[in-house]
A protein has these predicted regions:
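Acidic, serine/threonine- and proline-rich low-complexity intrinsically disordered segments
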Residues: 1-146, 189-253
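Short, surface-exposed, low-complexity cationic segments
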Residues: 161-194, 198
């Protein structure tokens, strides 16, 4: 205490908050210069908590947040439209979202600052709020969440998010469900053909193409020769143009 009194000008007390492992924590630290005299866990103030979250996100990136499948898909759809059509579709790259943190994620930042776990934060809602109006009315048409294939199945479209190497939307579907499909659907107002991952009955990739006409007219014959003996219960017709598309096996048909 006497030493503290003599060096009172070196005494400092502050609440230090940090965002680690998906939560904001804080401690009250009393220091004498570089020496820690006391370190006590405390509840962070909203201001300190919010500053800690913002600092961590800007330092370590948006991967600190909990990206659900719905949020990732929504971000990928927005990224496609911004890349292909430009404004008013929003830039959802890491840099753009970090620059506008308070604009699009304000209430969620506040919830984290007040102690909410990152796993409880739904990012799909804030991202959807970035949709421009009135253009948002065409969002599902320009970048659909699902596509219907000739078998009648609705298949989810996988959109890459900013930072991934590929920029192509992908549909992964069993080959038999696409018999007769001549052209790959095109997204973003006809600018981007969907890349089809045509799968075996065991859902292993047999072909990757956005030119289905060329596939049925050429490589399909080799795929058929290799697969019909391995999967005899599934249709492998000589003429894939005339065969009915199906998700079923021969026995069930």
């Amino acid at each position: 205490p006497q030493a503290e009194s003599a060096a009172s000008h070196l005494l400092a007390e502050a609440v230090e908050a940090e965002f680690r492992q998906g939560r904001v924590t804080a401690r009250k630290v009393r220091r004498l210069g570089a020496i820690v005299l006391a370190d006590t866990p405390v509840r962070p103030t909203p201001e300190a908590g919010r500053a800690a979250v913002s600092a961590a996100l800007r330092r370590d990136g948006l991967a600190l947040l909990d990206w659900s499948t719905a949020a990732r898909d929504l971000r990928g759809r927005l990224a496609l439209l911004h890349r292909e059509l430009g404004g008013p579709w929003p830039d959802v790259s890491d840099g753009a979202l970090l620059q506008r943190l308070d604009d699009w994620l304000g209430p969620e930042l506040q919830a984290l600052a007040e102690g909410a776990a990152v796993a409880r934060i739904d990012l799909a809602g804030p991202l959807r709020n970035l949709l421009p109006w009135p253009e948002a009315a065409r969002f599902d048409e320009l970048a659909p969440e699902w596509l219907e294939v000739p078998s009648g199945s609705r298949v989810r479209v996988a959109y890459p998010v900013p930072g991934e190497e590929t920029t192509r939307p992908v549909v992964a579907v069993k080959l038999q469900e696409c018999f007769g499909l001549a052209e790959s659907p095109r997204l973003a107002g006809g600018r981007v053909p969907v890349l089809f991952h045509l799968l075996s009955p065991a859902r292993r990739p047999l072909a990757v193409t956005d030119d289905l006409t060329s596939f049925w007219s050429g490589p399909y014959a080799q795929v058929r020769a290799e697969m019909r003996g391995r999967y005899p219960r599934h249709p492998w017709p000589e003429d894939p143009w005339a065969a009915p598309a199906t998700a079923r096996t021969n026995r069930r048909n």
